């Protein structure tokens, strides 16, 4: 049966690559016609099957952010990004508020209220979409950890820094006290332009992408075009 007929809220996940980065508007329109509740947009980290040749250019991120922010304001469904924390910086630069509350909760599977144009929370917002949903304010080692099927503990699925092994190691202790987790949660340890950026606390760049490209999880986000302006830290 159609999920909507069962009053289930539907989320659609899309990976942005060189093949579809120029089709964001078309995809957004298609999803609008399907009455979904959430569009989750994933930006590639060049590991595993996320091969380098599918990775978009830094300037294409900005173009993608512009279209996603447009649809976040216009569509009835919410939009969030994964592995693109610099989308929060884009939203702030363009007058949005990544911490803004979403529209009032709809009943399960119901179409959103017509005319609802509240600012949607961008990636990283700590606001809940509902009391049953985990907050969006998570990142590598910050609000999330990954435990493999064989017990290896990592800061995230795309950040293969081995920090322990369950059940020998307590996942709580690893999360709270392992040096890698503590480092990832400290924006003052960021390097390069990320370390100098006034958006380092609200953004901080993709630590998984930095590690995949440079081998250093605290290196600058390799796919960001923003040049820090030396202003106060946001």
Where are each of the predicted segments found?
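Short, basic and Ser/Thr-rich N-terminal targeting/leader segments
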Residues: 140-141, 202
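Flexible mid-to-C-terminal extensions adjoining Fe-S/redox cofactors in radical SAM and related proteins
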Residues: 110-115, 152-153, 157-234
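Radical SAM enzyme [4Fe-4S]-AdoMet core and its adjacent flexible, acidic
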Residues: 1-140, 146-150, 158-162
């Amino acid at each position: 049966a159609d999920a909507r007929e069962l009053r289930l809220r539907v989320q659609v996940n899309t990976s942005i690559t060189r093949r579809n980065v120029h089709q964001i508007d078309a995809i957004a329109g298609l999803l609008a016609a399907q009455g979904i509740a959430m569009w989750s947009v994933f930006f590639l980290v060049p590991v595993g099957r996320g091969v380098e040749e599918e990775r978009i250019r830094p300037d294409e991120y900005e173009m993608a952010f512009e279209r996603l922010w447009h649809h976040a304001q216009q569509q009835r469904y919410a939009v969030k990004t994964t592995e693109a924390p610099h989308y929060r910086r884009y939203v702030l630069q363009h007058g949005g508020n990544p911490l803004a509350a979403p529209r009032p909760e709809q009943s399960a599977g119901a179409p959103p209220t017509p005319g609802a144009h509240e600012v949607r929370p961008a990636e990283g917002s700590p606001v809940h979409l509902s009391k049953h949903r985990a907050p969006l304010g998570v990142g590598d080692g910050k609000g999330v950890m990954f435990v493999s099927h064989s017990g290896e503990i990592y800061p995230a699925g795309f950040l293969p820094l081995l920090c322990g092994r369950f059940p020998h190691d307590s996942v709580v202790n690893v999360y709270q006290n392992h040096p890698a987790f503590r480092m990832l949660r400290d924006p003052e340890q960021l390097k390069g332009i990320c370390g100098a950026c006034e958006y380092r606390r609200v953004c901080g760049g993709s630590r998984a992408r930095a590690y995949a490209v440079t081998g250093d999880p605290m290196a600058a986000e390799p796919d960001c075009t923003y040049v820090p302006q030396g202003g106060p830290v946001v």
